[in-house]
A protein has these predicted regions:
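Membrane-interface junctions at transmembrane-helix termini in multi-pass inner-membrane proteins
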Residues: 60-67, 109-131, 318-347
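Interfacial segments at transmembrane-helix termini and the short loops linking adjacent helices
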Residues: 34-35, 93-107, 113, 292-321
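Helix-loop junctions and terminal segments of transmembrane helices
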Residues: 21, 48-69, 235, 239-265, ...
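Signature of the first transmembrane helix
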Residues: 2-56, 200-227, 354, 358, ...
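Hydrophobic alpha-helical transmembrane segments
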Residues: 130-177, 348-352, 366-391
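Membrane-water interface segments that mark the loop-to-transmembrane alpha-helix transition
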Residues: 5-18, 42-98, 264-289, 345, ...
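Hydrophobic faces of transmembrane alpha-helices in multi-pass small-molecule transporters and flippases
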Residues: 3-20, 100-104, 127-131, 187-223, ...
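Interhelical loop/hinge segments that connect adjacent transmembrane helices in multipass membrane
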Residues: 1, 101, 127-132, 150-157, ...
Length: 403
């Protein structure tokens, strides 16, 4: 399957999922208010961080390990999904007043959703992955429609999402991968020690990367208000999320394709250049679209609260460009680079989040200033990372050609 076709299948499903996500935000804002949109965004961010903390990068092993280790890897990931999630939600309960039972089930089931996705990537089942991705936001929207009160929504969402993901796992899992030994403690212990370098470096990097992405919503809710977080959530959903989904679609395809190249000790530098050009082109078009089109959409189809989000959308433009043009290429460092280099990239981004949404609001509580600092620092940082990745890809190509 070609790069464009593989990425397009995942990207098309993501566009459809984005439509359901948009309807969820629209319905929630009109039915319950923008502050509840902020609380929903807070809950989702906490769940997404928890899913990555629970797996701790172990899902990246699913497409990379040999056939004999797939069963061990899946069992290891499932144990993490439920055991680590319990500890994570217990810690979160000290900082936020959230419905713990629903947050726990959501965190564990979103972890299993990632497991299912990466098993589909291993098998290159892009059509099935696309359908799964559409079904997840559809369940959220249906759960909201079925909720007479916003408090009921989280419990209905948690239960329905768990049933959905269990169905996908049952439908898509090849049970011939598993043996009785895969479920034994000693087998899991040996698996952990064999891959502990990956888990400690790549796992930490992935958790930090996800925290850098989700923490702004959490911290805006904390420092400013759920209403301001609602504005940020609207821009995230209608401007940033499509960008992240498109970038993730390319990243998922290249991760699957280049992981196979890694196993075969090759590197397709021509395809790397095609991906690079594709990302920069669509990033430029996306930024122009947000600048000119989003204000018109809010003016003609939104209300006063939606119009208030236009300023946020324009402050986010440098961040949007970096997320689409530069960030998906970090998969090269993830597969072919050293674990420490990928970890360093993510730690530097987390420091930018800390500087923009912790230090700045602590000394001067100004939402626009914090957001502008965050977007400019992120764009500058990822541009430097982008330049380094290009140099490393060129060296990698030359090294392989010499072999």
């Amino acid at each position: 399957m070609s790069l464009v076709k593989g990425a397009s299948i995942i990207g098309a499903s993501s566009v459809i999922s984005q439509v359901f996500g948009a309807f969820t935000i629209l319905f929630m804002s009109s039915q319950f208010g923008m502050a509840d949109v902020g609380n929903y965004a807070l809950t989702l961010s906490i769940v997404m961080i928890g899913a990555q903390v629970s797996l701790y990068g172990s899902h990246f092993l699913l497409p990379k390990v040999d056939h004999e280790e797939v069963g061990q890897a899946v069992v290891f990931c499932m144990l993490q999904s439920w055991c680590v999630s319990a500890v994570y939600v217990f810690v979160v309960s000290f900082f936020f007043s959230l419905p713990l039972a629903s947050v726990y089930v959501l965190t564990a089931s979103y972890s299993m959703m990632v497991i299912s996705e990466y098993m589909f990537l291993r098998h290159k089942a892009f059509n099935t992955l696309a359908i799964q991705r559409i079904s997840v936001p559809l369940v959220v929207f249906v759960s909201l429609l079925a909720s007479p009160k916003v408090d009921y929504f989280y419990y209905i969402w948690a239960c329905s999402h768990l049933v959905l993901i269990l169905t996908w796992l049952y439908k898509g899992m090849d049970f011939s991968y598993f043996s009785k030994q895969d479920f034994q403690f000693n087998t899991q212990k040996l698996f952990f020690f064999k891959h502990q370098n990956h888990l400690s470096r790549i796992g930490t990097a992935e958790v930090v990367a996800n925290a850098s992405l989700q923490l702004p919503t959490v911290l805006i809710n904390y420092w400013f208000s759920p209403l301001v977080a609602g504005y940020f959530a609207v821009v995230n959903r209608f401007c940033l999320s499509p960008v992240l989904i498109l970038g993730q679609s390319v990243r998922n395809y290249t991760f699957s394709k280049w992981s196979e190249d890694f196993r075969n000790k090759t590197f397709n530098y021509t395809e790397f250049k095609q991906v690079r050009l594709f990302l920069v082109s669509i990033a430029a078009m996306t930024v122009a679209g947000i600048y000119f089109v989003y204000p018109l959409i809010t003016e003609y189809f939104g209300n006063e609260q939606w119009i208030q989000s236009v300023e946020t959308s324009r402050l986010m433009l440098p961040y949007v460009f970096a997320m689409l043009a530069f960030v998906p290429l970090t998969v090269v460092e993830l597969i072919f680079g050293t674990p420490s280099s990928f970890l360093r990239i993510q730690c530097e981004q987390l420091f930018i989040v800390f500087l923009s949404f912790v230090l700045l609001p602590f000394f001067h509580k100004d939402y626009a200033l914090s957001l502008l600092a965050f977007t400019l620092l992120t764009a500058g940082r990822y541009f430097m990372v982008y330049m380094k990745i290009n140099k490393n890809a060129s060296k990698l190509n030359q090294g392989i050609l010499e072999k």
